[in-house]
């Protein structure tokens, strides 16, 4: 009889687990705008990964993972979100170089020069640091800084390291536009004139051709006019929602993962990453961006803040990297309120391209994409705060 009672109790508890609604879907039902997106989830190519975080008695994080329409084989353009692993591997390579005897840190001064002719003299022999380049990427997603970092690590280094760490859906095939210097191969040297960049003779590795939906749209804007035919993304950069969030988890909680599935980073590197990821645009050296009208304090945060240009509560920190291009908008973030202890991971992408034309810069970002990402994160945050 006792065994029967235990069996019935187990079945009841198991049924309760199955009956619990996916919190992602539940959060979208609480808002009319989100509900409308939910009804058209396939049109908007939504993919969402959400991880609840609780703490055990020792304060260690306990993850509970949820997904909505996540499919690693369905392509979406990662845009600037792929800059996060570029930065991670920049720090990784700095440590590799230091192990060979080169005296270098993220704060070290470096010489960045162009391999082109005198017409680009303005870019020759400029002195900066990896810290400044990385800060500019996190604060305003600077493309030139990102492309310099790509030439520092090299495509092969990036793609090989991603596979070694278990991220098999993340590939780097090209640099970022718009950038007036996108075709320049940058040479990076130490102040001792040691060449440390890896930009020459790089072989790019294209995304697995088994990937689905590599062609998007019905038309494309080309040479000043709309021409028929889908845009082919087969040679573009590639990532997945799962890879993005798992990379971020290793940055926020590196001790929760096996060393062979993390990166060659030290404690200072992780602190450095977390600091700059969580900055609002005008914080620290970001004060220099106040003179440019297109920027605002929450410019680099789709989640929680959206188009609200004023940061209203700095107790809520968003450790993230956003991306937006070709109709795709993405945010990949660890969100934490240091006052009430609410914390979670959220990674989401949405595709908005009503006229089905690629490259015409008419993508409903402000009308649909950014409001979706901000409202989704706010709804999930509210549920956790109850």
Predicted features along the sequence, with ranges:
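A short, well-structured edge-of-sheet supersecondary motif
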Residues: 29-70, 346-348
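Active-site-proximal beta-strand/loop segments in catalytic clefts of secreted hydrolases
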Residues: 51-53, 138-141, 152, 174-175, ...
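Structured C-terminal helix/loop/strand segments within mature extracytoplasmic catalytic/sensor domains
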Residues: 19-35, 226-386
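Active-site-adjacent helix/loop patches that line small-molecule binding or acyl-intermediate pockets
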Residues: 21-33, 124-253, 257
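Bacterial Sec-dependent N-terminal signal peptides
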Residues: 1-24
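Residue-level preference for non-acidic, small/hydrophobic
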Residues: 83-90, 137, 162, 244, ...
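Active-site SXXK
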Residues: 76-105, 346
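Short, glycine/proline-biased beta-turn/loop segments that scaffold the active-site neighborhood
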Residues: 96-127
């Amino acid at each position: 009889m006792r065994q029967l009672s235990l069996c019935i109790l187990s079945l009841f508890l198991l049924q309760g687990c199955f009956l619990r609604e996916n919190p992602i879907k539940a959060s979208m039902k609480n808002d009319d705008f989100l509900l409308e997106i939910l009804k058209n989830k396939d049109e908007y190519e939504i993919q969402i990964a959400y991880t609840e975080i609780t703490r055990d008695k020792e304060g260690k994080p306990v993850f509970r993972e949820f997904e909505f329409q996540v499919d690693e084989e369905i392509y979406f353009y990662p845009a600037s979100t792929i800059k996060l692993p570029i930065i991670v591997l920049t720090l990784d390579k700095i440590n590799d170089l230091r192990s060979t005897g080169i005296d270098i840190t993220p704060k070290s001064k470096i010489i960045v020069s162009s391999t082109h002719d005198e017409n680009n003299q303005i870019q020759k022999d400029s002195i900066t640091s990896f810290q400044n380049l990385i800060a500019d990427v996190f604060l305003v997603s600077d493309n030139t800084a990102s492309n310099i970092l790509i030439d520092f690590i090299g495509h092969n280094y990036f793609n090989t390291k991603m596979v070694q760490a278990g991220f098999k859906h993340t590939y780097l095939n090209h640099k970022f536009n718009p950038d007036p210097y996108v075709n320049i191969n940058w040479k990076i040297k130490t102040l001792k004139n040691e060449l440390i960049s890896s930009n020459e003779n790089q072989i790019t590795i294209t995304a697995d051709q088994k990937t689905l939906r590599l062609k998007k749209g019905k038309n494309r804007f080309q040479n000043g006019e709309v021409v028929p035919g889908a845009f082919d993304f087969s040679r573009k950069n590639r990532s997945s929602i799962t890879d993005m969030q798992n990379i971020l988890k290793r940055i926020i909680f590196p001790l929760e993962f096996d060393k062979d599935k993390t990166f060659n980073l030290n404690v200072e590197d992780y602190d450095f990453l977390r600091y700059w990821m969580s900055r609002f645009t005008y914080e620290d050296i970001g004060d220099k961006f106040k003179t440019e009208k297109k920027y605002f304090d929450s410019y680099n945060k789709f989640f929680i803040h959206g188009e609200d240009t004023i940061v209203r509560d700095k107790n809520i920190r968003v450790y993230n990297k956003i991306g937006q291009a070709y109709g795709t908008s993405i945010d990949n973030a660890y969100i934490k309120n240091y006052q009430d202890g609410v914390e979670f991971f959220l990674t989401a992408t949405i595709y908005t391209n009503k006229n089905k034309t690629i490259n015409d810069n008419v993508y409903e970002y402000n009308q649909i994409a950014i409001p979706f990402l901000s409202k989704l994160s706010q709804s999930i945050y509210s549920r956790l705060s109850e």
